[in-house]
Swiss-Prot record:
Residues 38-80 are annotated as: Disordered. HAMAP family: Ribosomal_uL4_B. The keyword RNA-binding applies. Belongs to the universal ribosomal protein uL4 family. The gene is rplD. Keywords: Ribonucleoprotein, Ribosomal protein, RNA-binding, rRNA-binding. One of the primary rRNA binding proteins, this protein initially binds near the 5'-end of the 23S rRNA. It is important during the early stages of 50S assembly. It makes multiple contacts with different domains of the 23S rRNA in the assembled 50S subunit and ribosome. This is Large ribosomal subunit protein uL4. InterPro entries: Ribosomal_uL4, Ribosomal_uL4-like, Ribosomal_uL4_dom_sf. GO terms for cellular component: ribonucleoprotein complex; ribosome.
Length: 200
């Protein structure tokens, strides 16, 4: 299949990487697994056994007329423990490499189908100036965009850093969430070739 390149001749790309069917279930699984892997999972609360104190019973078992109490650290007491206290846990979800790559191929193919993938010969700025990049993107009619190149250009990265709804990634740093989060994905020809190498 062919991909149109802005201001240049169309390039030939593999159907396997950019022309496959959209597998929504697989993409959903990849996105959930990716986001779950970013969760800290270190939340911890104290149960009645973790709270300091409460060893001596507050009053004797019988004779006071009050309900019996064995500790001041039970969940119904102020300063007591939590009934079902949160414990540190690993939220990571396993996703096979083959499935992850298939999900990325599915996303790229859907971007092509929905005309959200903008291919350019090259994309760079001369200096790390946000104004210059904003002007360049406005000229292309892009405001909410992910810029993907084969290697991150320092000037481009610094220029985009202060722009909302604009992100710069290299091919290796692209993930399912970033690829679907933006209205458009601006990608260089060299990045297209690299995606083909990695996912082909």
């Amino acid at each position: 299949m062919q991909l149109n390149v802005n201001g240049a001749q169309a390039i030939e790309v593999s159907d396997r990487t950019f022309g496959g069917e959209f597998n929504e279930t697989l993409v959903h699984q990849a996105v959930v697994a990716y986001m779950a892997g970013g969760r800290q999972g270190s939340k911890q609360q104290k149960t009645r056994s973790d709270v300091s104190g409460g060893g001596k019973r507050p009053w004797r078992q019988k004779g006071t007329g009050r309900a019996r109490a064995g500790t001041t650290r039970g969940p119904i007491w102020r300063g007591g423990g939590v009934t079902f206290a949160a414990r540190p846990q690993n939220h990571e979800q396993k996703l096979n490499k083959k499935m992850y790559r298939a999900a990325l191929r599915s996303i790229l193919a859907e971007l092509v189908r929905s005309e959200r993938l903008v291919v350019v010969e090259d994309f760079a700025v001369d200096a790390p100036k946000t104004k210059a990049l904003a002007s360049k993107l406005n000229g292309m009619g892009l405001s909410d965009v992910l810029i993907v190149s084969d290697a991150v250009d320092q000037n481009l990265y610094l220029a985009a850093r202060n722009l909302p709804h604009v992100d710069v990634r290299d091919v290796q740093g692209s993930d399912p969430v970033s690829l679907i989060a933006y209205d458009k994905v601006l990608i260089t020809v060299s990045a297209v070739k690299k995606f083909e190498e990695l996912l082909g």
